[in-house]
Amino acid sequence: MGEMSLEVYGIGLVDDASSMAVAVYFSDPGVLVVAKPGDDAWAVVYNGTLYSTVSSAGRFYCCIGIDVMMLHMDQQPRLLMAAENSKSIRFSQMAHSVHLVDNAGELMLVHRLTCHDSQNNHKRKYEVYKVDLDAGALVSAKSFDGRAVFMGRYRTISVAAEAFPSIAADTLYLGCDFAERTSTGRYNLIDRSSRLINDDSSAEMYPCSIIHCLSQCIWGMGNFNGLEHPQCNDA
């Protein structure tokens, strides 16, 4: 048999009062593994597709569909439900994506979905939810509490808008690994408006990360002509 090529999709830490561990999610095939200090081997926690992963407040979270799961460490590590979709949120594995983000210590989820405009054309829409861990539910949110969120296909980060003059608060910035970036560079949650970022970089330049998008917006580096296939992974 030939060697299997594994691609790291997400990595995070579990660091609470009872345990410390490293969690790694490999895609294609999807498998979540975990190891604690002193372990001789990785333990398989979950086989299947996870749509987003993030570490927040010493916990490791992931999405199965649009349900938010938490990695629970005990003698047998396992995923437990942290926030369940109330079934009022429609999720399509083919057309939608979900993105967890640690927003200054508060866990949030961005739902990227497809809808139709008045001319029946397909367009992207973005719904944001706070993950209420006490209630175990997703609560609709209309802002990022004054912060800005930079979203890539595999990683999403939150930054303080006031730290950078060129960044708008309560705004979602799309990474160059999303096709709609050419028409929707940034999306304001307050007024639901979108605006194209001044960006001459080619959508065919891969791999591209959310860090690339963040750098462009902060320093105004909208032109990458002359750069040869930048290696800007999300790690």
Task: Show which residues each predicted segment covers.
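A sequence/structural signal of beta-propeller blade repeats
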Residues: M1-Q119
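C-terminal closing repeat unit and adjoining cap/tail of repeat-based domains
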Residues: D117-A235
